[in-house]
Each structure stands twice: as structure tokens, then as C-alpha cells.
Amino acid sequence: MKTDYKPRIADRLLSRKLAGKGAVLIEGPKWCGKTTTAKQQSKSMLDLGDSGVLKQSLQMMDISPKTLLLGDTPRLIDEWQTIPPLWDSIRDEVDKRREFSQFILTGSSVLPQADETIHSGTGRFAKIKMRPMTLFESGESSGIVSLRELFNGKSIEPLACGTDLRDIAYLTCRGGWPMATFLSGDIALDQAFDYVESVVERDIQRVDGVKRNAERARILLRSYARNVSQQVSYSTIKADMLSNDSKTLDEDTVADYIKALKKLFVIEDLAAWNPNLRSKSAIRTSDTRHFVDPSIGTASLGLGPDDLMNDLDSFGLLFEDLAVRDLRVFAEALDGKLYHYRDSSGLECDTVLHRRNGTYALIEVKLGGEKLINDGVSALKELASVIDTTRMPKPSFMMVLTAVGQYAYQRPDGVFIVPITCLRD
């Protein structure tokens, strides 16, 4: 099968980071395209994902570590974390050369010793987190609505971008795995199932050398999927697991498995936003549970597109997982981060895109339909009304991001209604 490279938003981030640092570390889940993206800008490569190369490199590390770093620059060190001492060698080499764009490192897990090592690279290394493809990157979004332009104050005339809900169900189950975007039908859907199987059978054992039960990892992923896009505690997840796991299970065990899955970049929870408010409501600080890609949730539950169409409540939560994936990628391209908001009065906002310059946008995520859209608009306007604009700016814009809709448009009250298949960074 011939595959052409589909440009990634990370291409721009990598180019920018290389221009100002001696080395750039690209992290993210396996199969998300880190190595392929790095190859577009590297001039030589050390492929430690190849067992033969790894064996020889381990021997060379004892004799002459510097030899592994020789080659045209930027030099790509793929799966660097398999030889953690390489980090110090690269850091020292960057100090010695005193030049930018020397090394690109990629890794799909964080080993304990590597985790400690990473902190020693301050100032020499930049970090980029890659995720599976957004719909814009995979070609399923036209990109006619730009978040950057909305932040710059641009309004939009009604733009046609019709989407079929069944197509969104398929894209949710397929996920943004680059290889899957070149495939179709059930063959494309298989990729997510293969990914989950690889994680529970191999990766969760190898990430830190701790022996874990594959079936328990499966049960945890299923419990996480049932609670995706919700602010639930570990104790709630444990209770859900116990209904499917007759073995003794404590909260520490649940936390250990979740920590391992976070190190593998499988799970990526959404932190709470903490704005200045005029109200006395207490802000809830619990994370919202999310996967790095919604297909992990659907595959863990054994769901396909038809299953989502027959259970719109679950579909809505898994679609929110997809929207969070895309918005996180877009946020990083805009020097921003994504958060969620919820307070003691029950007021909530699915996502808040907060940029480094202090500007932010409030974004609700809905499947679509007049009632759900109106509910989203009401929540956005209520949250905007309690933000203390004497201490922080008002939102740059508010948006309801939908799965379906014939048009992207701006309502008379200023709120944007945008189908996700129209959106880009």
C-alpha cells in the first residue's frame, strides 16, 4: 500500500522549535506519526525501534556514545528512551556544538529513568506533544473556519459544510491514526482494536517493568470509556471495574494502571480552568477523563459506528472526546492549552481554549440539533456573565462545536455554531 505524507500541524511546531533549540523531543502515543513527521525535517537517523540497531547501539554506548550522534543534522534519534543515558550525551553534545537544529528525539513512552533524565535538559531541549490526526489533518474537515482568525476578531458569513452523523460515528471509531486514514471500512476500524490489544498485551508491561494483568488493563480501559468526558473519581472507576472484575481491587492499583497508561500517552485527562469570578461558586478542580483518541474508547468497549448511532448518549460523550483531541492540537498551534470548567452551582463548559497571551475562548461540544445547541449557548452565556472582567478579559469568542449541521454561522448574539468538519487551527 502506497501512502503519501499528510501534512501535520506539528510540522510547523517542529520547524519553529528547531530554529531556537539544539534538540527537540517529540512525545506521544505510538502509531500517531511521530517518526514520520520527524523524518520530514531530519537529515540522518538512528532507529532504536529496530532491534538490531538497538542491540548494536547499546554496545556502542559503552564504548563511544558520541559515535551514535554522528550524522547530518538535524539527526533523528527514534525511540530514544530505550537507551536513557543518550539524553545526557545529547545534552552535552548540544552544549559543545552551540548550534540549533541538531537533534530530534521521538518516544512513545516515558521510562522511569528517562522521566528523571528529562528534567536535566532545561534550556537545551524543546518538547512537542503529538496526538493522532485531527479531522483537518486527515482531510475530513474543510478548515473553512479558523480558530486563529476568530481570535483575531473575524466574523463569518454562513458557510456550507454539511455533515452526516453516521460519518462522524465512523470517524469517532476509526480515530486519527495516520495509517487508518489511508484505509476504509472495517480495515480502517481494525487499527484501533489492534492498538488497544498491543497496549494491554505488551506496552503496559514494558513501560516501567512492572508486571500487570492484561485482562485487568482491558477492564480499566472499558471503565474509562464508560466514564469518558466526565469528571469521575478513581473510586468511581474502581467501583465500575469491580462489577466486571471478581479479584480484589484497591484504589492504589487503579491509580497504578492509570499512571502507566498516561506514561504511554493512552489517557490524557483534561484539567480544570480557574478563572476570576464575580460569583461565590466554588470551582471544581477534578479532571475530565479523556483518551488521546476517541477510537481507544470505542475499541475498548467493542463498539462500531452502528452502536453509536443506536446510543446517542454514549455517542455524545465519545464525540466530545474526539472534539477535545482536535481542540488540543489546535490549541498548541495557537500557543494555548485546553481546559474544562465546572463549579459548585452546576455551571460547566466542556472546553476552554486559553492562550499564552491571556486571550481565551469558551467552547461547548454538542452532537447537534436545535435543543442541544440552545443548551450549549445558554451555558456559554451564563459562564461569560459570571467572569470578573475587571480582573481578566472577556472571552474572545464563544462557540458551540457540533458533530452535524449544514452551516457554520454566527448567531445574532455573537455565538458561533460550527460543525467540526469545518474547523481548523
What are these regions (language model features)?
Residues 181-359:
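Accessory nucleic acid-recognition modules appended to NTPase machines
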Residues 26:
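Hydrophobic anchor at the beta1->P-loop junction of P-loop NTPases
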Residues 1-15:
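N-terminal pre-Walker A segment at the start of P-loop NTPase domains
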Residues 34-35:
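Conserved lysine of the Walker
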Residues 115-230:
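Interdomain motor-coupling "hinge/lid" segment immediately C-terminal to the ATP-binding subdomain
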Residues 87-111, 119:
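Conserved catalytic/switch belt of AAA+ P-loop NTPases
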Residues 401-425:
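Domain-level recognition of nuclease-like catalytic cores that cleave nucleotide substrates
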Residues 45-74:
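Short glycine-rich substrate-engagement loop in P-loop NTPases that contacts/grips substrate
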